[in-house]
Amino acid sequence: MWILALSLFQSFANVFSEDLHSSLYFVNASLQEVVFASTTGTLVPCPAAGIPPVTLRWYLATGEEIYDVPGIRHVHPNGTLQIFPFPPSSFSTLIHDNTYYCTAENPSGKIRSQDVHIKAVLREPYTVRVEDQKTMRGNVAVFKCIIPSSVEAYITVVSWEKDTVSLVSGSRFLITSTGALYIKDVQNEDGLYNYRCITRHRYTGETRQSNSARLFVSDPANSAPSILDGFDHRKAMAGQRVELPCKALGHPEPDYRWLKDNMPLELSGRFQKTVTGLLIENIRPSDSGSYVCEVSNRYGTAKVIGRLYVKQPLKATISPRKVKSSVGSQVSLSCSVTGTEDQELSWYRNGEILNPGKNVRITGINHENLIMDHMVKSDGGAYQCFVRKDKLSAQDYVQVVLEDGTPKIISAFSEKVVSPAEPVSLMCNVKGTPLPTITWTLDDDPILKGGSHRISQMITSEGNVVSYLNISSSQVRDGGVYRCTANNSAGVVLYQARINVRGPASIRPMKNITAIAGRDTYIHCRVIGYPYYSIKWYKNSNLLPFNHRQVAFENNGTLKLSDVQKEVDEGEYTCNVLVQPQLSTSQSVHVTVKVPPFIQPFEFPRFSIGQRVFIPCVVVSGDLPITITWQKDGRPIPGSLGVTIDNIDFTSSLRISNLSLMHNGNYTCIARNEAAAVEHQSQLIVRVPPKFVVQPRDQDGIYGKAVILNCSAEGYPVPTIVWKFSKGAGVPQFQPIALNGRIQVLSNGSLLIKHVVEEDSGYYLCKVSNDVGADVSKSMYLTVKIPAMITSYPNTTLATQGQKKEMSCTAHGEKPIIVRWEKEDRIINPEMARYLVSTKEVGEEVISTLQILPTVREDSGFFSCHAINSYGEDRGIIQLTVQEPPDPPEIEIKDVKARTITLRWTMGFDGNSPITGYDIECKNKSDSWDSAQRTKDVSPQLNSATIIDIHPSSTYSIRMYAKNRIGKSEPSNELTITADEAAPDGPPQEVHLEPISSQSIRVTWKAPKKHLQNGIIRGYQIGYREYSTGGNFQFNIISVDTSGDSEVYTLDNLNKFTQYGLVVQACNRAGTGPSSQEIITTTLEDVPSYPPENVQAIATSPESISISWSTLSKEALNGILQGFRVIYWANLMDGELGEIKNITTTQPSLELDGLEKYTNYSIQVLAFTRAGDGVRSEQIFTRTKEDVPGPPAGVKAAAASASMVFVSWLPPLKLNGIIRKYTVFCSHPYPTVISEFEASPDSFSYRIPNLSRNRQYSVWVVAVTSAGRGNSSEIITVEPLAKAPARILTFSGTVTTPWMKDIVLPCKAVGDPSPAVKWMKDSNGTPSLVTIDGRRSIFSNGSFIIRTVKAEDSGYYSCIANNNWGSDEIILNLQVQVPPDQPRLTVSKTTSSSITLSWLPGDNGGSSIRGYILQYSEDNSEQWGSFPISPSERSYRLENLKCGTWYKFTLTAQNGVGPGRISEIIEAKTLGKEPQFSKEQELFASINTTRVRLNLIGWNDGGCPITSFTLEYRPFGTTVWTTAQRTSLSKSYILYDLQEATWYELQMRVCNSAGCAEKQANFATLNYDGSTIPPLIKSVVQNEEGLTTNEGLKMLVTISCILVGVLLLFVLLLVVRRRRREQRLKRLRDAKSLAEMLMSKNTRTSDTLSKQQQTLRMHIDIPRAQLLIEERDTMETIDDRSTVLLTDADFGEAAKQKSLTVTHTVHYQSVSQATGPLVDVSDARPGTNPTTRRNAKAGPTARNRYASQWTLNRPHPTISAHTLTTDWRLPTPRAAGSVDKESDSYSVSPSQDTDRARSSMVSTESASSTYEELARAYEHAKMEEQLRHAKFTITECFISDTSSEQLTAGTNEYTDSLTSSTPSESGICRFTASPPKPQDGGRVMNMAVPKAHRPGDLIHLPPYLRMDFLLNRGGPGTSRDLSLGQACLEPQKSRTLKRPTVLEPIPMEAASSASSTREGQSWQPGAVATLPQREGAELGQAAKMSSSQESLLDSRGHLKGNNPYAKSYTLV
């Protein structure tokens, strides 16, 4: 039974399972029509597909599945339908012109495609033609390609030809979308060509050419519009583009007006009027309607009326898109349709049409709604909505997925064994839709409610049904197989398991079983009780199984009988259960086998209507009784059909006495007995013989028109209609008609002849057959009526003017025929003068003749012969051309050359006769035409000719004649022309070459001989190439303008040290002359371009390295190799670099000896020639080999206890390799025993234990490398002591570390007891305990750690260890390495393309400089470049810079710690300036009537190469300039083709890299006789600005007066400046002696006054200025872009105070003495504040956190207020606790960035002090207490007397460096206070003097320079502040300082003299330096200083008014 249950469950699962991941879809849903050529065949893929793979089938539209027809039709396995090529005789409408569809089917369902109409196009001959057209000149012509209607649908016009030349749509010719050719703006010459169209068959690809048609062009004549092109109706789909043609002929040009549905159409947006008509873009359904094109002019109106049908594509959409439901539910689908209103809609399910039924409802007006109730599993699948309208169709589909509602067992009970009286509960949890019903059985017997079994049921929240079977007290009879069965409308499922109740085994009685023969049967043994031994089955005492069809399952007692057979399997079966070994029980069951009926198959034969039918149904086997019944089409047969059924025993027969069509259908015979019911079905088809529905009758057909011969029939199967034809009216001899595109059989059987021809007349037979009965046929006669046709007429004809002309035409057709003649659409009256018409009949034809007597020119035109009869009319157009002699041609000059003249002519009226030739006459201008040279019979096909062999520059006269067949024309117009120049015939002379560099050659030459120039030499071509014997290098060509008889040119960018060949050619306007003879020269030698390659180095010993390399190629040497240079240096262990050395050799290898052992060396190799060193190779690194190390640098030993000592040592000074270990030796002499101990290579101490007390030991240490043991250290004696004194094993020395790192200072001490350790630091010579804080601490082992070490941590540290028995001390010198200080960068030399920079390095920060990074940027650019520079360099030259351009530079030094701070930005300019034109040169070298030579030698390039030269000129009074542009400047330039006797404006613009210059001039060409013309001043010429020339003259006089005044003022300034220079020279001579005195003082110590240490200093860090006095204590940093802004109140009365804004704070504790700060602002450019010049953008900012900070002392508090730019560093008053506050304010001077300000810039090494001030600054520096340890160096130099502009570094374009100036005086130009060595503890103090640029800046001088001046001035004044305020600069970025509390000044006594004041002034500690209080004192009196003060302040007080900048001296 279990097997049965599982089998049932599996069968249900197979039936109702579904792959929800399967799908169906359409690949190409738009495929609805396939048209192909019969000669090619076609492949049609099925447009449907699916996943998993689908089964594809093709059907006809009738629903019949198609089959393969060999060689004609085949369906491929992939579903592709193939139609093979076929001849026309094999055409079958059923196959080749039919509607198909395909289906795709997989487990998801089945879908069918849209109907696909497949149509074959038969190949048939056809012709296309074009008709002649008429039009008027200037109007439009339209040609149409006429295609036969039978093939019109398949033919496309692809192109048009004009005399075999393809036309392209353009300005005059337009090919429309319909294939018409439009010719716009028709000209007479358009009528000279033939036009034809080219067509292509869309499916066969065949092309056809039409006949040639002519265009007859007439002169414009007033006429009403006549339509040339129009339309009647158009059909289009929405979204397409539609063109509605409408074009008319008329004069004047007609107007067009469009109407839609009788309303004017607005032509905008999508509606556009075009040349061809109306263009509608993106059409819409609303655009459908009637369109009218109205064409009108004043002579009439014409219309084109048509209709536009816009169809919207059909679209069907089913909703919802996804349907997922369950069995038994309702599903509703809706299909919405767009694109049509009257459509046919149908529904399909799985490809089959769906009709309304019991559970199916279709509702809606258009059947758009589908409702399905009580869905069953078979209702799932694909549903489609089909919409059909005419030939269009659309569909949509949706997949309806029905969830499997079949009941499923979720969980159930399991087999178990229970004891009697034990309760049992069985559960079945079932899921299904709808909810299933659960029943229980026990051994196949139903279990009813009540008794011992309790059944309950519930529904869970998940929708599951749970049924429980409970047994409260089980008994043995309750045992057995329990089954729960769940069923609903979707199916049934069961589950069973055995419940065993312990007790005696027995068998429950079993019921007899009925089995069906041929099927499987299961017999279950109903055993109860448990346990038992076995279950066995017997049949007739035979143990089963005994054959293959019997299976006994011993474990559950089930017997299976497969394929039951009545004879064998029927009988009694016994189940035997073995209860105990000797005890068994049994039960029997009887099995009865029933045999089901079997019907012998039968089929209906072929029957025809009216016949009798008898069909028997015989049941050949099966148990009786058997009942037999019949059905038709699945239903009982109604009695009305007259069908008789006879049943006898096991047979039944069906009889029909009179067969009719209503008997068609499927008949089923059904046989039933007790076993089963079976059926057999067969189809009865009643066949009907054919008969006519419509019989053919005699008809008339009109020639050229279509005719339908009616014939239709009916029958079953559908009859076939065949037409046959017999030509003529005789006895019919019928033959099959060959069907083609012209003759076709319609679907109803009628015959269509699309274009009737005369040969179609005759008998036609319509034959109908369908293989049922006899065929039927009927004949008819077709009579062809011929309309009137013109069969013969001349298209064109000619007549000679004044002679008689006849024209005839022949007409054919049904009589009578009327013929009339027309001229230009006007009927000719035979009675008209000069016209005579005659008509006669000749057989079937009518001939009409028109005579013209005589012909005149006006007769030229179009005549038409018009024939008319009852069936039609025809017309023949004849073009008559009246011929006469031609008009003369109009000639013009096409081209003039030196020896040829090319004519071009335009032919006038040709006399209506083709031109037969031309005659050309040519003569010298002075000769008569009788002597002219004649060229006759020039081809008429030509319109140009060339006259050859003329002389250059000669003048000729030329004329022409035209000839045709009638005669010769009059002579043409006469032309006079002068020949052009010819190319020179001679080469340039005296060509010389001179190499001037390694890449340049200077070329000089002279012009060719005069008689060979053939014109004016305008330039030359220089050809040069690398010269090689046997080589064939092409010449490189350079064009050069001429500058005179002697020329010079420099070739640049040549290859170095290379031989070149050079030629020169002269050029004039005509071309280039012959080349000069090739000259050879060689460029100069240069340094090698590349380094040696393959540089290799191998260490051969600890002190030597072997180096080898490859030599350079010849191309890389650039000269003759002189040798190689090897540069090498050691890379030391601490990162420092050793000495750089070099060795020279001539060989490609070298051995380096005497090197350091085990040292890494950097090696570079270069090659050098006679020109110098080449490029170095890349560095390679090689280390020398290891050697034994040196002895340890130091050894210490100390007793740690009575039996132990410690030994420590330092590593060897010379490691010579990698230390592998250290060996410690210990020995004592009595007895001599030496012990060895090994220590690791990173250990520097060792403990030796187990020694004897009070015994001396000797210890020493040896280092070991891989090369062996090194030398021994010194021997130390040590003695173990019980009372061991404190000893430190660490060595004294120097410890170096980078800053910002953690450093540990070791101090390892030993002793007994353990010593105490303390650390001291030396501060100013006084040791003090180190500070222990968060950054400093002492470890337990005595080591001292400093975290994040800083520069101030440097110094001497002492470690002291002591215990009871002694003490020890070491001193460690900690040196903290910091990034290097900024270098001082200067400009040492400038050229036009390079700048040489030099620098002085700053403090290296305790680590050697590793290199420099130079950054540079072009002015006004934000892009910076950089170069790495070797640390040994102190200068660098930047090459290839732009000439006359400003550049910015910064420099950064790098050491082992990292890069230092960036130097100040300096600026320098390469030499050169913009071009200038010399006033000494004349611009115009020569002027004649039409040419001017300009002298360009006057242009000075300013030192920079000219990059462009632009010249423009124009006649006065015109606005258009003639422009000439060059990239280089020649010596001269010639203006050609000028107007005679005309004034011209000329302007030139010449540019180089430094700038551009312009020059304007006026000139006048000469009269034809060489005389000059009147000047411009005599006429009033209106210029562009509207000023007359007289007004311009007034303006010129005004400007001249102003210039004269400025010039006089300039002369006055020069005189004043000269006097001041003389006074300055005198002061310099006076200062020389003072300099000598100061230099002698340099060797002795200056007496200084005792001063208290300054505690208050204010720091102001301003870029581009440096303070040369440093103080590192008590300082703060203020923004590096700041400016000090001092208000008047700051230096006013003490009671006045002001507030300010604070952003940076500096605190001061007390007031310091004002000894006067010294400020150097010399590196700032006067007038150009670097911080406010936004275009001077530098790289990283120059601020630094670790470098020394510059400081300023407080000045006197009572000085007046001023605002200063950042060009200054100012002393600022401060009080205790005062605060700096910063605010930003900007004020930009208009002249700050002018080039004048640039030219007066001073370099970063300049200062504006006088020589006296410099000397006094030096003397004052020696008095400073902080500089007492400094070493002073004084540099004596010469100071130039030139202006500050000439002393500016890098700004003078005429000097290369500062030293180029002429020296005039010597003296001190720099002194330096050098810092002492670090162990001396000194500070660096540099010194300089302030620079005051303006008279009012006297207040900024330090007290020792200004006290004598101020103290020697008396008298009150009120204008002091005002005067100083006027002398100040405009503020830039400023800082406002708060007014501090004014301290009471200490009075000072005036010195007796200025010198005593300056040299002897002393200051009291803690006092404030002040000036004497002078109420109302006027500072303006400062201008009245004495000569001594003037000497002190030199130019400061004298530059007021003229030059605001002071004299500057350069500090080197």
From Swiss-Prot:
Keyword presence, Metal-binding: no
InterPro entries assigned to the protein according to its UniProt record, in alphabetical order: DSCAM/DSCAML_C, FN3_dom, FN3_sf, Ig-like_dom, Ig-like_dom_sf, Ig-like_fold, Ig_I-set, Ig_sub
Chain segments carrying region Disordered: 1718-1810, 1855-1883, 1971-2012
Domain Fibronectin type-III: 885-982, 987-1086, 1091-1187, 1191-1285, 1379-1473, 1474-1575
Region (Required for netrin-mediated axon repulsion of neuronal growth cones): 1617-2012
Position of the signal peptide: 1-17
Tissue spec: Primarily expressed in brain.
Compositional bias segments (type: Polar residues): 1855-1865
Ranges of compositional bias, category Low complexity: 1799-1809
Function field: Cell adhesion molecule that plays a role in neuronal self-avoidance. Promotes repulsion between specific neuronal processes of either the same cell or the same subtype of cells. Mediates within retinal amacrine and ganglion cell subtypes both isoneuronal self-avoidance for creating an orderly dendritic arborization and heteroneuronal self-avoidance to maintain the mosaic spacing between amacrine and ganglion cell bodies. Receptor for netrin required for axon guidance independently of and in collaboration with the receptor DCC.
Free-text note on domains in this protein's UniProt record: Ig-like C2-type domains 7 to 9 are sufficient for interaction with NTN1 and commissural axon outgrowth. The transmembrane domain is necessary for interaction with DCC.
Designated name of the protein: Cell adhesion molecule DSCAM
